[in-house]
Regions:
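Generic recognition of stable, solvent-exposed alpha-helical segments in well-folded globular domains
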Residues: 18, 66-69, 175-182, 213-224, ...
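Intrinsically disordered, low-complexity boundary segments flanking structured domains
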Residues: 28, 98, 127, 139-140, ...
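Acidic/aromatic-lined carbohydrate-recognition and catalytic surfaces
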Residues: 2-175, 185, 189, 200-272, ...
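Short acidic/polar active-site loop segments enriched in Thr and Asp
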Residues: 37-39, 193, 376
Length: 489
């Protein structure tokens, strides 16, 4: 499957109108033809938590969202992207429930990772635990096996409860390979074009390592699942939050990767009034990436920016974002914090709010994203230039909900009337339709307070100039007659 070089939308199944049916209605009524690049529907499956990222099964769509028919209907107009949480399943899945009932005699016993699978005595030394890149304070959860009363400690990378509701799977086991094949086949049967391999960096569990992106084991798994996907006509997109060198290794092997570095670099440039660091980064990054500014989690810092930032600069950016209502996701592992104790994993907030609801700055940020080589993704809150929703974060106790507002159809229609949204829609159309973006990219020389980017393909030429002193951005492009046209962003 060939990924189209057009803008994609990221949305929850219920965030634009309430379900997949209303999502399709909103797309066709208000955004017709705008997202031919694809619609990334965040997990629409039955789930026990984490807003869909604790899947009970992939064979069904959660009834409150709709059916597979709704997914197919959306897919007839735009390629559909779905998530496959290759690292874990819900504790409420039939697979883990059978394991809790029958323990070692369960037909799914090899699917999960009890501590004894890595440490024969089942008791990992504290110094080895401290090596891990933790996403919760402890990487394990204790459960009682119903058949025997035995307490079993299983690997749970993610989860906000104790015990966790997200149970890691052993991707090298026969059961996992069989299930992943069945899940991917279900996706193919329903016309899914791209599968995002959520949290794939955490699938490698090996004693004496960080158990994150362990080489060469990670490549063996990726080769297997990419081969499976390709045979089914599906493209895979590994989701890996790691330092840039690790990401670039994936790119060198021909995988699509996420540009998790760009959001911070754009934010830093607009807040510090200099494009020097952003320009240096654009010159070194590989082009085969999905670009983003915002998503359902936050603006990545550690480990994504490791080796690319100074903590004193990052602290300034973080402090400004906090003043504008953001909250932070911390790094739990002391060994993986910055040398001076800097411990920000992600900045959580609406990108529009992080830029102080400044229309010009926000649209300049989007223009930079769209001119950066890669496939641009726009998160649904960002599409509507939405702001922080602190009440949602307070109500749920999940700081990420600050950027996960659910819009009714009436709200969508109201937000569409705002000039900033109309300007963004025009920018998306330009990015989708202008031929030069399939041509040659160039970073032009400029003073540090300006970013100057251009694309050229035959007679089609376009150039973006962003002045960080004023937050103003201007596109100059050649029309069908070759005449220059200025397009204020």
């Amino acid at each position: 499957m060939t990924v189209k070089n057009e803008v994609q939308l990221i949305t929850y199944p219920d965030s634009l109108g309430g379900n997949l049916g209303t999502l399709d209605h909103v797309l066709q009524t208000h955004f017709a033809g705008l997202f031919g690049g694809g619609i990334h529907i965040l997990p629409p499956f039955p789930s026990s938590g984490d807003r869909g990222f604790a899947p009970v099964t992939y064979f069904d769509i959660a009834p409150e969202f709709g059916t597979w028919e709704d997914v197919r209907r959306i897919g007839k107009k735009s390629p559909v992207l779905l998530d496959l949480m290759v690292n874990h399943l819900s504790a409420e899945s039939i697979y883990f429930r059978d394991y809790l009932k029958n323990g070692r005699t369960s037909e799914y016993a090899d699917l999960f990772i009890p501590a004894r699978k890595i440490w024969p005595d089942g008791d990992p030394p504290r110094d080895e635990i401290e090596q891990l890149f933790l996403r919760r304070r402890e990487p394990f959860s204790d459960f009682t096996i119903g058949e025997t009363g035995e307490t079993v400690r299983v690997w749970t990378t993610f989860g906000k409860t104790t015990p966790s509701g997200q149970i890691d799977i052993d991707v090298n086991s026969e059961s996992a390979r069989r299930l992943l094949t069945e899940f991917m086949t279900k996706f193919a049967e329903n016309g899914v074009s791209v599968v995002r391999l959520d949290a794939v960096g955490f699938v490698t569990k090996k004693r004496g390592t960080t158990c994150f992106f362990v080489e060469p084991e990670i490549y063996r798994f990726l080769e297997w699942i990419a081969g499976l996907a390709n045979a089914l006509g599906i493209e895979v997109l590994p989701e890996v939050h790691a330092d840039y060198a690790t990401q670039f290794k994936l790119a060198e092997r021909g995988y699509w990767i996420y540009d998790f570095i760009l959001p911070y670099m754009v934010l830093d440039a607009l807040l510090s009034r200099t494009g020097k660091r952003l320009r240096e980064y654009l010159a070194m990054r590989p082009p085969r990436q999905f670009t983003m500014l915002d998503c359902h989690d936050g603006v990545p810092i550690i480990p994504d920016l490791n080796g690319l930032y100074r903590s004193e600069d990052a602290r300034k950016v973080v402090d400004i974002c906090l003043q504008r209502g953001a909250n932070l996701s911390p790094v739990f592992s002391p060994r993986h914090k910055g040398p001076d104790g800097f411990d920000v994993h992600q900045i959580r907030g609406a990108f529009y709010s992080l830029l102080d609801r400044n229309d010009d700055a926000y649209l300049a940020a989007r223009a930079i994203q769209f001119f950066t080589p890669g496939v641009p993704q726009v998160y649904y809150v960002g599409l509507l230039a939405g702001g922080n929703d602190p009440s949602a974060a307070e109500r749920t106790g999940d700081g990420r909900e600050i950027n996960r507002h659910n819009y009714s159809i009436d709200e969508v229609e109201r937000e569409l009337q705002r000039p900033v949204v109309q300007r963004l829609l025009g920018l998306i159309r330009f990015r989708n339709e202008y031929d030069a973006f399939d041509g040659a990219f160039q970073i032009r020389d400029s003073e540090d307070s300006v970013l100057d980017l251009s694309w050229e393909r035959g007679r089609s030429q376009c150039r973006l100039r962003v002045d960080f002193r004023t937050d103003k951005a201007m596109i100059r492009y050649a029309d069908d007659d070759g005449k220059p046209v200025d397009l204020p962003v």
